[in-house]
């Protein structure tokens, strides 16, 4: 499968710097607020916006949020589906991911099979990604019936990541879970990064620029933040939080 426009954009930007993606969950964010957040992301030059969530927003709810983001943001909007329903024709691309450490084959290949023809019909760019849940896993781990990687076992995470690469996945995502008390451990990030040759995404539990700085220093290529922005009391507060997180990427 050829590398598409959005994936090429990611690789070209990674040649120059580490990246920061913002995750917006349509279950928790109205189209109006999503549009305002997207405008802030545009002004701060956030590298991409991901749209999705573990509880599976879909249909008109998802479409309206994606459209509001697209109206206010010129860079890629990438779907991050919790299941096969989380697909919108208005996005630029989709992380076509497999939850490698799920106990349930539905989240490894089942949901992907159910969603594949819709991705093709909408002419969405699929970006193959290995998705790995790390303790505590939070809602993503519970919904995805994952067997979370123990935080003190970085080699297990590295084994899954390398397996994902060998299966043809072109990105690896280490997920501690939205709202996790702590991010993925730096030692795990470093161990995984040494094992693989594809870009490494890290998300979940990231609340400060200092945490971002440490994760980037450990080897994260792309940092994903979501809950930290969604929980802000106002758009201006969200802007300040994003500015702090953004500074951590620029080490």
From Swiss-Prot:
Pathway(s) where this gene product acts: Membrane lipid metabolism; glycerophospholipid metabolism
Coiled-coil regions listed: none
Record's keyword annotation contains tRNA-binding: no
Swiss-Prot/TrEMBL keywords: Cytoplasm, Lipid biosynthesis, Lipid metabolism, Magnesium, Metal-binding, Phospholipid biosynthesis, Phospholipid metabolism, Transferase
Cofactor(s) for this UniProt protein: Mg(2+)
Any Pfam family: PcrB
UniProt binding sites for sn-glycerol 1-phosphate: 173-179, 204-205, 226-227
Organism: Pyrococcus furiosus (strain ATCC 43587 / DSM 3638 / JCM 8422 / Vc1)
Name of the protein in question: Geranylgeranylglyceryl phosphate synthase
One record GO biological process: glycerophospholipid biosynthetic process
Catalytic function, reaction form: sn-glycerol 1-phosphate + (2E,6E,10E)-geranylgeranyl diphosphate = sn-3-O-(geranylgeranyl)glycerol 1-phosphate + diphosphate
One Gene Ontology term of the molecular function aspect: imidazoleglycerol-phosphate synthase activity
Family according to the record: Belongs to the GGGP/HepGP synthase family. Group II subfamily.
Cell compartment(s), UniProt: Cytoplasm
Function: Prenyltransferase that catalyzes the transfer of the geranylgeranyl moiety of geranylgeranyl diphosphate (GGPP) to the C3 hydroxyl of sn-glycerol-1-phosphate (G1P). This reaction is the first ether-bond-formation step in the biosynthesis of archaeal membrane lipids.
EC number: 2.5.1.41
GO annotation, cellular component aspect: cytoplasm
UniProt superkingdom: Archaea
HAMAP family: GGGP_HepGP_synthase
Principal cellular location given in the protein's record: cytoplasm
